[in-house]
């Protein structure tokens, strides 16, 4: 197969696709370059039908640290398990691709993204999504694409920027990922600085304009190198099974679906499913594999009855499983100070969804070190989300976080990061853990609400409280209904999970996943409007529990003292091989000390006496004088701009001419003379250690 190269200018930069040279044994493969970002993406299908009752799609995002000129850290010096960024990138791409496969397609498909080179100006996730869609589209794999994505930000003047650089994202009002087909949007992921619903909608639609260009380019390539799609056996339920289920269990299943209490509803449905399988006249001649397949068909037919009834209720009757109105939020409950000892805790309950969030404060030196392909080297704010099986009344796996738990934690972190105070304002590392205790839908948004409460209870001076809500959609052709605060079954049987989080002022994060091909502007607009109304209602509940962050930290939280030392004294404070700083820590009851490059020193400990001891030890080395201190010394030099006073050994300070007297002074010699003994006050020590003084009085000569 000869190598073929395709090129197109997208957003003033060349997008290059190579096909036919690399990874030729995969079902589809492309090498895509945009700027200096290069990815090799393969799509492979298993020709045998799997025995699972869902479409087995896997997206693997392989970060190679050589792509950014790094050698991996650690003892092994090679890539290990995916980083958080890799996991989240794979989820974004998966969410854009999955709606474009038939739900009855049961052959295993694996997308492998090899990140080969990365620059700071071209987002590797968007290049990877484009390449993944193209690899699928030119292959034999049945795929209703192509699909593409765009990265969008909005600058401070509300100008929309497509495919922004890292600097533009950091300076902008949002980081928005939009994905979709040429006709509709099917995935949105955004973090934003309290933007309006209208501005967010404009940015989403602007991103879709670029998506259409990318899809047109894919169509050009598909026409030249695409191959016919494979003949596949789509999963389907046999007519006799549908008849058996409808005749014997449809009425009871519909009644069960209307039970308001989740646990009772699920138990009743599960019992009916067990009875249907047990009572079905299973031919004894069937093999174990055939019996398993028939059981899957029975379960599917039974679940389809529930699905049709729930969707009919919402679309036609405009009623919901638990009797709520379409825009009604479940009962809300908020509590703080749930736990002793910890630095901050809160419990948030919405219906049968309940989350406990706990805040822990630590020294800046306890931040998370990141070894990946992004420019981020560390972070001082973390939000971790745990979803144990008991939260849905089941037994199950306990261990490292799943991809879903990582994703939900990251969404909460994206929201909360917008309201976390800067390091200068609040020099602590902050970790929040959200423990899901009960789940009936939208636990990620409940964790945001609980985390906000816990932060305020902990005394973290957040800029504004933030809460979240999950919206849903039921759509049949042109008839659709939007739901506020979806519960688990509405999420499972619906067409959209649309999460919106923000403050009273605006949106801080947005995440949309759908199961249909896409949605239009009108649905987006309506969902955003309803989400804002719900958000403000939840915010009232949070503020009724605690109206503002506490002005003090918990007694168990580490106390801290921050001060500046001259930059040229940092080395002396640390000492050769760290001996001096180690000695200070040991003499001060194991305090934690952080020293920044600009000379900012922060000392942490539970006891103020230990902090003060460490402060005095550092001061003796690096700060022979402090602001406010009064010192007597001789005038050693006179200049046009002021006079220098000798303070201590190897240490002089400057009295600027404007600080010699209250009235205007023409010449310094009009006030003081060389060798005069003066009393001065230290008024400032700048970042370079230069000492500025104010004259108090000239002492009489002896």
Swiss-Prot record:
Please state every residue range assigned to the domain named S1 motif: 628-696
Q: Which UniProt keywords are listed? A: Cytoplasm, Magnesium, Metal-binding, Nucleotidyltransferase, RNA-binding, Transferase
Purpose? Involved in mRNA degradation. Catalyzes the phosphorolysis of single-stranded polyribonucleotides processively in the 3'- to 5'-direction.
SUPFAM superfamilies recorded for this chain? Eukaryotic type KH-domain (KH-domain type I), Nucleic acid-binding proteins, Polynucleotide phosphorylase/guanosine pentaphosphate synthase (PNPase/GPSI), domain 3, Ribonuclease PH domain 2-like, Ribosomal protein S5 domain 2-like
Q: Does the keyword Aminoacyl-tRNA synthetase apply?
A: no
Tell me where it mainly resides: cytoplasm
GO MF annotations in UniProt: 3'-5'-RNA exonuclease activity; magnesium ion binding; polyribonucleotide nucleotidyltransferase activity; RNA binding
Catalytically driven reaction(s): RNA(n+1) + phosphate = RNA(n) + a ribonucleoside 5'-diphosphate
Note the Pfam families from the entry.
KH_1, PNPase, RNase_PH, RNase_PH_C, S1
The protein's organism comes out as Spiroplasma citri
| Top-level taxon | Bacteria
Protein name (database record): Polyribonucleotide nucleotidyltransferase
The record, for Gene3D superfamilies, names: GHMP Kinase, N-terminal domain (3.30.230.70), K Homology domain, type 1 (3.30.1370.10), Nucleic acid-binding proteins (2.40.50.140)
HAMAP family per record? PNPase (MF_01595)
Record's InterPro entries?
ExoRNase_PH_dom1, ExoRNase_PH_dom2, ExoRNase_PH_dom2_sf, KH_dom, KH_dom_type_1, KH_dom_type_1_sf, NA-bd_OB-fold, PNPase
This enzyme's EC code(s): 2.7.7.8
PANTHER family for the chain? POLYRIBONUCLEOTIDE NUCLEOTIDYLTRANSFERASE, POLYRIBONUCLEOTIDE NUCLEOTIDYLTRANSFERASE 1, MITOCHONDRIAL
